[in-house]
Each structure stands twice: as structure tokens, then as C-alpha cells.
């Protein structure tokens, strides 16, 4: 058995454990979707959940290391954040609306401002 096969089998086992034990359900996500990600933040001695809402502009499928890049415009400045989907820091992921795009990566949205950054809504996939 090669090292890569061993690593992939261990990652598959860990993902199954996470799916069985975790209370958070990760919806089926696509590039272009608008999501609200609840991020656990510890301030002082208190822990709270901070929502981060934006459009998914990129996804990386890597088993346990699966990530999404979420972009939003805050006070006229574009802010992008990369989230590990299986991280314990992620409290929940809520799907707001589906987006209709023809690209796997939406990096072209970085060069656009205002209404040009909007993504059309997709109605043929359920929320």
C-alpha cells in the first residue's frame, strides 16, 4: 500500500466520523452560491458566532481539506475569506441563494464593482 493510499483512506475515515458525530450539516454547495458562514470567535473568555455572508468564488475539493473562498464587499472594499469546511471553527453554513454561473472560479469578480458583481439566481437547483 502506497503512502498516498494510506492518507486517503485515513481522510475518508475521518470524514465519515465527522458526518456521524457533527451536529452541523454542510449543504451541497456550488460556485456562485450565496452563503452565510457562522464562524466561532473567542473574545476574552466568551465564545460567539460571527456570521460572514458572501458569494462563493472558488472551491477546492481535497477530502478533509475541502475549502471554499467567500467574497463580499464591505464598505466599498472587497473582502475574501477562505474557510475549511470541516474545521471546528465553522459553526454552521446556511445557503441563502443559488447562483447561475458558467465558470469554476469566479476570480473575474475581483475586478468589478457595484452592480457588476451580482450573480444571476438559479432556480433549477433546490436550496
Swiss-Prot record:
Alphabetic keyword roster: Ribonucleoprotein, Ribosomal protein
One Pfam family cited in the UniProt record for this chain: Ribosomal_L19
Any GO CC annotation of this UniProt entry: cytosolic large ribosomal subunit
GO MF assignments: structural constituent of ribosome
NCBIfam families on file: rplS_bact (TIGR01024)
Family membership: Belongs to the bacterial ribosomal protein bL19 family.
Protein's job: This protein is located at the 30S-50S ribosomal subunit interface and may play a role in the structure and function of the aminoacyl-tRNA binding site.
HAMAP family: Ribosomal_bL19
Protein name: Large ribosomal subunit protein bL19
Source species: Trichodesmium erythraeum (strain IMS101)
Organism classification: Bacteria, Bacillati, Cyanobacteriota, Cyanophyceae, Oscillatoriophycideae
Amino acid at each position: 500500500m502506497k503512502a498516498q493510499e494510506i492518507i486517503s483512506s485515513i481522510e475518508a475515515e475521518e470524514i465519515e466520523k465527522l458526518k456521524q458525530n457533527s451536529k452541523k450539516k454542510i449543504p451541497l454547495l456550488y460556485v456562485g452560491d450565496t452563503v452565510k458562514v457562522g464562524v466561532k470567535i473567542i473574545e476574552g473568555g466568551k465564545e460567539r458566532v460571527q456570521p460572514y455572508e458572501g458569494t462563493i468564488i472558488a472551491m477546492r475539493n481535497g477530502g478533509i481539506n475541502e475549502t471554499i473562498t467567500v467574497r463580499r464587499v464591505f464598505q466599498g472594499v472587497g473582502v475574501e475569506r477562505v474557510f475549511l469546511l470541516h474545521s471546528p471553527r465553522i459553526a454552521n453554513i446556511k445557503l441563502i441563494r443559488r447562483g447561475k454561473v458558467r465558470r469554476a472560479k469566479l476570480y473575474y469578480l475581483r475586478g468589478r464593482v457595484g452592480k457588476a458583481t451580482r450573480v444571476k439566481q438559479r432556480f433549477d437547483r433546490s436550496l
